[in-house]
Swiss-Prot record:
It catalyses: GTP + H2O = GDP + phosphate + H(+). Residues 1-51 form a transit peptide. Its main location: plastid. SMART domains: EFG_C. It comes from Ricinus communis. It is found in: Plastid, Chloroplast. Keywords: Chloroplast, GTP-binding, Hydrolase, Nucleotide-binding, Plastid, Protein biosynthesis, Transit peptide. This is Translation factor GUF1 homolog, chloroplastic. Promotes chloroplast protein synthesis. May act as a fidelity factor of the translation reaction, by catalyzing a one-codon backward translocation of tRNAs on improperly translocated ribosomes. PROSITE patterns: G_TR_1, G_TR_2. GO terms for molecular function: GTP binding; GTPase activity; ribosome binding.
Amino acid sequence: MATDLSSSSTLLLSRNCKTPPFYHTTNSLSLSKTHHLYASRNAVVSRLRLLCQTTGSTQSTPTSGVSDLQFAAQVGQHRLSKVPISNIRNFCIIAHIDHGKSTLADKLLQVTGTVQQREMKEQFLDNMDLERERGITIKLQAARMRYVYENKPYCLNLIDTPGHVDFSYEVSRSLAACEGALLVVDASQGVEAQTLANVYLALENNLEIIPVLNKIDLPGSEPDRVIQEIEEVIGLDCSNAIRCSAKEGIGIIDILNAIVERIPSPRNTAEMPLRTLIFDSYYDPYRGVIVYFRVLDGSIKKGDRIYFMASKKDYFADEIGVLSPNQMQVEELYAGEVGYLSASIRSVADARVGDTITHYNRRAQSSLPGYKEATPMVFCGLFPVDADQFPEVRDALEKLQLNDAALKFEPETSSAMGFGFRCGFLGLLHMEIVQERLEREYNLSLITTAPSVVYRVNCVDGDTVECSNPSLLPEPGKRRSIEEPLVKIEMLTPKDYIGPLMELAQDRRGEFKEMRFITNSRASITYELPLAEMVGDFFDQLKSRSKGYASMEYTFIGYKESDLIKLEIQINGDPVEPLATIVHKDKAYPVGRALTQKLKELIPRQMFKVPIQACIGSKVIASEALPAIRKDVLAKCYGGDISRKKKLLKKQAEGKKRMKAIGKVDVPQEAFMAVLKLEKKPWSYKYKMSVNC
């Protein structure tokens, strides 16, 4: 079958031509022109022969007598052949969650022949089990693709990014390593809140943005309406927007051609001293720290002595290579290319994300501007169930922090739970993902305290103290005022749900700022509200009240003084530190009442009566009593003298009194999350802790 390599038709890299899979492609925006093309092994050989001619490679092309493994190896080697820097394109895919980023990345890998059909699976770049189970992207991933356009080979470096607001830091790291971005918008849902946030990040990095309308094959898709939304809300010119269906393979070639035509190539700075920017890294137990980097200036070879400018450490580059998408070794990487590095780095602190790598003997004059430091917004305590696992928890957090630069932690002690760590996260989903990764990847058993935010306490002596742990809040006589963090939240919703969402924001002490209609049927509502009011079930309530149609995006704007107090929980007369929380004075009573009632349901009944109290200082504002389990000590008495029964009842009462004084109350794990009524999965509840009461 003859194949025109210069046309924008789809070429399928398939060895078996008897039952070849197929792709849809279109050379225009009309679905009626969709056609199917089949390519056999001979077409692949022809394409590789063209690559050899255009790159000047002397390696022979695959012949009919080579084996499957040899054939695949030769395909891989041609992907590694060098191309001019003018033929390199670095781009990422940004979008709102569930708009089809990972599916589009899968199809790009498949159409360019980077991944063979038999190796293909859904969410190919999502390596973690958590990502596949939840259907979301958590970690950015990179892949190198080879594409022939107008008889010239191009190297396309793709970086797939997360879509959830909690992982916007991952997106910012991807953008710093690219010159362009594919802005993917669901043609049926339209512009969402995170779409706006990602576009603003891309514009700040001066990226060329290519609008892509995905899922046009759905019956409810409205591409014309969505194009109008993008132009009115974002201000992008969508006259050349690409309409595609990543699932069906429609418009994929148009996207690849647009990447080549519209995204600029990197600057040619190969003669300058080496400067590479680390945009990701992870810890391998056998090879040490593996660094993902983008070469901005100069070139790096295998065996070079390299220097990390921030940590001031030097190593020898034992192995360098590209991600295609699996790691493939090369001898040298030049300016504009993206790759990985292994240098037997054993200390996780020596290769931080955002650091600059240069040559040890020919150092660059200045380091590259690193990333904006991630600011944790939500804090909670992580404690091992087994106190002997404290060193393992510390090592696991250090290794996880290497791969997740937004994670912050410091040691913490609690009279109830012993030694642990106070950890900072970007949001609730980030917190949940980190805890589950610690339990899955490092086999740890953890207890999580209720999440909180960082408060600023202005003391009477003039000092300002930041407090993320309610149990460490200064005494009332030592503090003058308390400031809480504020966020600006933008909710995009159909007009039918404007009322319920405004009611939700006002119930959470929100201050209305602006409302504007994006289209006749969709509106944008802006509020300022305390971050503490969002830490909980705010997102769940937003989805519930809008029947799943609304989306939100928030940004931190600063601190504001507020009338806040510390609410303590006492069980059997003793305070339980992990259950302490900071609340607004007007909400103290309803929160205390709801919390004591919730704890009464969660704490198992004891052999003695257990009082559960919510206190502000020494004042009890809400109280519940957990009744004792009654044992019928008179069951064996069948008549007889009444004094015998009185003696047994008196003995039982004395025993209960003694037990109440020295007894222990088991507080289940879900009690710590009950402070904010978080709905956790069953695996979070399987551990209990004992509080001496």
